From Swiss-Prot:
It catalyses: 1-(5-phospho-beta-D-ribosyl)-5-[(5-phospho-beta-D-ribosylamino)methylideneamino]imidazole-4-carboxamide = 5-[(5-phospho-1-deoxy-D-ribulos-1-ylimino)methylamino]-1-(5-phospho-beta-D-ribosyl)imidazole-4-carboxamide. The gene is hisA. The active site is at D10 (proton acceptor), D129 (proton donor). It comes from the Bacteria. It is an enzyme of class 5 (isomerase). It comes from Frankia casuarinae (strain DSM 45818 / CECT 9043 / HFP020203 / CcI3). This is 1-(5-phosphoribosyl)-5-[(5-phosphoribosylamino)methylideneamino] imidazole-4-carboxamide isomerase.
């Protein structure tokens, strides 16, 4: 079994950037998003996590550039940022992205999200951006309800997958919140993609052995050179040999 790794390409004002704890204004620029995505593809990525931060913060969009990035690569793309109604959902899917993440709308417009899940099925994942057990909305600028109440509702609505981000650790290189991941996977049978805080190769192992976690988004660690994507993929590919079968649920 392997842990699916999704190197991140976050786009703001036409540039690939990384934020610290999701704070607008904390961006560090890493250049052309297309080149970033192609670099991860050349390094062996099978998925890329692509985010339109301007759309997420409600300050515009990079729609044409995002579509160019998706077209430029030959790997699967998970697309996130500002998907809150039929028009933005259809536009996101029209880029050719394999999967889209819905965040704020899952908290503010549950009826629409229920209909979207009915219509699109497992091409939708819901992003659960968490501080403690409180969800964050509108680009992490507003509180959005209690994690486990929302999780139960989304499970009942048929959500196929969750992307769980500890906002306090995102972009900080302080390690993942494994206890948060364990609490979420204990509350749902749906697969979880972990996000936030990965700093070392050992962090990937710690994530992978949580039953129910199928993938991990990696951002700052790759851009800062903490390790390379080929190194991370080698670790992820060896997860099944770790422990006494404790990673048996990974990648389901």
């Amino acid at each position: 079994m392997t842990l699916t790794l999704l190197p991140a390409v976050d786009v703001a004002d036409g540039r690939a950037v990384r934020l610290v704890q999701g704070e607008a204004g904390s961006e560090t620029s890493y250049g052309d998003p297309r080149e970033a995505a192609l670099t991860w593809q050349r390094d062996g990525a099978e998925w890329i996590h692509l985010v339109d931060l301007d759309a997420a913060f409600g300050r515009g969009s990079n729609r044409e550039l995002i579509a160019e990035v998706v077209r430029a690569v030959d790997v699967a793309v998970e697309l996130s940022g500002g998907i809150r109604d039929d028009a933005s959902l259809d536009a996101a899917l029209a880029t050719g992205a394999a999967r889209v993440n819905i965040g704020t709308a899952a908290l503010e417009d549950p009826d629409w999200v229920r209909r979207a899940i009915d219509r699109v099925g497992d091409r939708i994942a819901v992003g659960l951006d968490v501080r403690g057990t409180t969800l964050s909305a509108r680009g992490w600028t507003r509180d959005g309800g209690e994690l486990f109440d929302v999780l139960a509702r989304l499970d009942a609505d048929g959500c196929a997958r969750y992307v769980v981000t500890d906002v306090r650790r995102d972009g900080t290189l302080t390690g993942p919140n494994v206890e948060l991941l364990r609490s979420v996977t204990a509350a749902t049978s749906r697969p979880v993609v972990a996000s936030g805080g990965v700093a070392t190769l050992d962090d990937l192992t710690a994530i992978a052995v949580v039953p129910g976690v199928e993938g991990a988004i990696i951002g700052k660690a790759l851009y800062a050179g903490a390790f390379t994507l080929p190194e991370a993929l080698a670790v992820a590919g060896n997860i099944g040999n770790i422990g006494n079968g404790c990673a048996g649920a990974v990648g389901r």
